[in-house]
From Swiss-Prot:
The lineage of its organism: Bacteria, Bacillati, Actinomycetota, Actinomycetes, Kitasatosporales. Keywords: Ribonucleoprotein, Ribosomal protein. One of its GO terms (biological process) is translation. It comes from the Bacteria. This is Small ribosomal subunit protein uS2. Signal peptide: none annotated. GO terms for molecular function: structural constituent of ribosome. GO terms for cellular component: cytosolic small ribosomal subunit. Residues 250-261 have a biased composition (Basic and acidic residues). Gene3D superfamilies: Glucose-6-phosphate isomerase like protein, domain 1, Helix hairpin bin. Residues 275-308 have a biased composition (Low complexity). NCBIfam families: rpsB_bact. Residues 250-308 are annotated as: Disordered.
Length: 308
């Protein structure tokens, strides 16, 4: 089954590029034609690139990796947060802080600070041992950290790959990822530079429906990778490494486990009659051997004839 269909891409407006005066000549090979001053992206190429990106993301997650979702423009914020949360991956949908990847050790300290602030009960002034003014200052600090770092609060290390919506707007994130040799998977509009992206998806990065569709496809790849990772861990008898599964993934795997347990007793019952039938002929075998034991009695007359 195809990851996404041509019809879905068309209905979501993935084929619409930028105006002809706002383009990057390096994107020429991905452009199908031009209509009313707007470039039309070749969706046949987009489909093949989507499949390639899907397989890469799935394999990365299956081997214990994480994928960071990045999209701070208004059209992408909701889709990025929703899809990343669905599959339990880190995301940035507000402002990209410089050094989020290249200076992660410092960012990690701020994440620890956020967790400390989350332990404070701002409603109970007496129990906190702080004045109202001090609590107000801390609550503002917490709100600021939640806004900028809330999406990556569970991240322990730099991601294995990043999914980016609009590489021109997120050029700092792209630069940091390339500096650390982290693979970049991104939507490429007609004004982007394809050389900056490892796994490119030619498409519209401005329309909400287009961004939502492509982000959902990447999230589906992550979900499939999580299931594969969990299956491999069960086969080895070890818990799979990396980020924990999302709740819906755990429910799915537990359902499969219960179904397997229900089938096991039925298979055991079916084997018992077969074993009994196989043992019955074996029990009768000694009776068939009885005539052989009587053979010496038949030879007795021959011995009497010799004596006569």
């Amino acid at each position: 089954m195809a990851v996404v269909t041509m019809r879905e891409l068309l209905e979501s407006g993935v084929h619409f590029g930028h105006q002809t005066r706002r383009w990057n000549p390096k994107m020429k090979r991905f452009i199908f034609t031009e209509r009313n001053g707007i470039y039309i992206i070749d969706l046949l190429q987009s489909l093949s690139y989507i499949d390639r990106a899907y397989e890469f993301v799935k394999e990365t997650v299956a081997h214990g990796g994480t994928v960071m979702f990045v999209g701070t423009k208004k059209q992408a914020q909701e889709a990025i947060a929703e899809q990343a949360t669905r599959v339990g991956m880190p995301y940035v949908n507000q402002r990209w802080l410089g050094g989020m990847l290249t200076n992660f050790s410092t960012v990690y300290k701020r994440l620890q600070r956020l967790k400390e602030l989350e332990q404070i009960d701002f409603e109970d002034v007496a129990a906190s041992g702080l004045t109202k003014k001090e609590l107000l200052v801390l609550s503002r600090e917490k709100a600021k950290l939640e806004k900028t770092l809330g999406g990556i609060r569970e991240m322990q290390k730099v991601p294995s790959a990043v999914w980016i919506v609009d590489t021109k707007k997120e050029h700092i994130a792209v630069g940091e990822a390339r500096k650390l040799n982290i693979p970049v998977v991104a939507i490429l509009d007609t004004n982007c530079d394809p050389d900056e992206v490892d796994y490119k998806i030619p498409g519209n990065d401005d329309a909400i429906r287009s961004v939502t569709l492509l982000t959902r496809v990447i999230a589906d790849a992550v979900a499939e990778g999580l299931i594969a990772r969990s299956g491999a861990g069960k086969a080895e008898g070890d818990k799979a490494a990396g980020e924990p599964l999302a709740a819906w993934e755990r429910d799915l795997l537990e359902g499969e486990k219960k179904a397997d347990e229900a089938e096991a007793p039925a298979a055991a019952e079916a084997e018992k009659p077969a074993e009994a039938a196989a043992e019955a002929p074996a029990a009768e075998a000694p009776a068939a051997e009885a005539p052989a034991a009587e053979a010496p009695a038949a030879e007795a007359p021959a011995a009497d004839a010799e004596q006569a």
